[in-house]
Amino acid sequence: MKKPFVTKEQIEEIAKTYPTPFHIYDEKGIRETARALFKAFSWNKGFKEYFAVKATPNPFIMNILRSEGCGFDCSSYTELLLSGQVGAEGHEIMFSSNATPDDDFRLAYKMGALINLDDFTHIDVLDKLTGIPEFISCRYNPGGEFKTDGSPNVMDTPKDAKYGFTHDQLIEGYRILKEKGAKKFGMHAFLASNTLTNDYYPTLAGILFRTAVEIKEKTGVELSFINLSGGVGIPLSLIHISEPTRLLSI
């Protein structure tokens, strides 16, 4: 069993000052995990980790992660404000949202965030609100079901998801964005969460890199980055998790 980072006696002492319930965060563990992640991808000089603010919209945690080199993935006006308040700016912030209010797009554009369009219709919406920025990203939904080895993933049926461009919309979307003045492009996809094996990210990367080649062939658009979204799950049993994934677990 994993040893807790805080003892029963320490918790009892803290409870004398702070009324329960409360959360205690392991700053040492957070920093060590972030450093292990960056070390694992040190071979890739362009690697950037974007922490999903929705997961823990706590400015103290965000400050810790930013000091370790993380950017922020935002999906709302409030998350953009929080990211700005801890000092993040420009492409340290990636804005990915669904059913986006106009003011959210305006703020993301004003902050210089990297805007990741979730829907084909957002191209015209953003163009009318702010104009298309020179650097833009699109969220891809290939449809179907996303399975690796039968692990109990969450949200692993893209065909039923409300997020992202379909294949044909994606090709046409990049063509339109290029015509509207965009110069640099990215692509993002979220196909499953709570993944407990080593298969998810290589499989997702394969789908996106093959799609990137097709985009280049059909539109002339060459992608500057690919964002591998989704999440490493927390195992209920160590039997269901492989060693590399366990090293990244919280």
Whereabouts are the PLM-identified features?
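A charged N-terminal "starter" segment
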Residues: 1-115, 120-134, 179, 183, ...
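Flexible, glycine/proline-enriched loop segments at strand-loop-helix junctions
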Residues: 21, 110-115, 154-165, 195-202
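Short, electropositive alpha-helical surface patch
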Residues: 195-211, 242
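Short, well-ordered amphipathic alpha-helical segments that serve as non-catalytic structural scaffolds
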Residues: 169-175, 205-215
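Internal alpha/beta core interface subdomains
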Residues: 182-193
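Conserved anion-binding
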Residues: 123-183
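Glycine-rich beta-strand-to-loop/alpha-helix junction loops that act as flexible
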Residues: 191-192, 226-233
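Single conserved hydrophobic/aromatic residue that forms the stacking wall/gate
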Residues: 239-250
